Amino acid sequence: MATITIYDQTKKEVGSMDLAPEVFEVPVKPEILHLVVRSQLAAKRQGTHATKTRGMKRGGGAKPWRQKGTGRARAGSTRSPLWRGGGTTFGPQPRDYSFKVNKKVRRLALKMALTSRLSEEKMMVVKNIDLPEIKTKLFVEVAEALGLEKALVVVKDADNKLLLSARNIPGIKLITADQLNVYDILKARQLVMLENAAQDLQERLK
């Protein structure tokens, strides 16, 4: 069983925590992480792109010139895809890009992402972050003390002081434990969890 040091918000050691091997010591399979990240990114796509076919274009009802006798190529509509201002052939239409990934696979991928960050020593557990008021400057001071740059900070419950103080800092993303996902973990250089969030996560993923 792995253990991890617990720090306070000034980065002083205040204890340690045992990490469940079934959550933080699972074999990492890149293909599963890739599948889940692809699924997350696909679900984010709006899919509202659209082009008009010749039938959707306004006008083009009258035949431009008679069928025979002009010496020109025959034409039936000014909205043919061959014409400037005509419709588009096989252009994109609105669609849903999302695809299903089984819950067990998503859960396994989350464990793999956590294992990966722990093995790379890019994970930190902090006892608590306590701010006296909502102020970005106060959170910046904590982030600098902890050495955070491009970091994902995970809290157990939505704390308004923390959420509002951290939301305007470039490179810092703060989410609750139940929002934790594979894409955010892998995108961030550092994963920082409050102690109660780490405990809650372990219990849920065991």
From Swiss-Prot:
Keywords assigned by UniProt, alphabetized? Ribonucleoprotein, Ribosomal protein, RNA-binding, rRNA-binding
Top-level taxon of origin: Bacteria
Q: Which Gene3D superfamilies match?
A: 3.40.1370.10
Q: Quote the cellular component terms of the Gene Ontology held in the record.
A: ribonucleoprotein complex; ribosome
Q: Which GO terms describe its biological process?
A: translation
Which family is this sequence assigned to? Belongs to the universal ribosomal protein uL4 family.
Q: What does this protein do?
A: One of the primary rRNA binding proteins, this protein initially binds near the 5'-end of the 23S rRNA. It is important during the early stages of 50S assembly. It makes multiple contacts with different domains of the 23S rRNA in the assembled 50S subunit and ribosome. Forms part of the polypeptide exit tunnel.
Q: What is this protein called?
A: Large ribosomal subunit protein uL4
Organism this protein belongs to: Maridesulfovibrio salexigens (strain ATCC 14822 / DSM 2638 / NCIMB 8403 / VKM B-1763)
The beginning of the lineage is: Bacteria, Pseudomonadati, Thermodesulfobacteriota, Desulfovibrionia, Desulfovibrionales
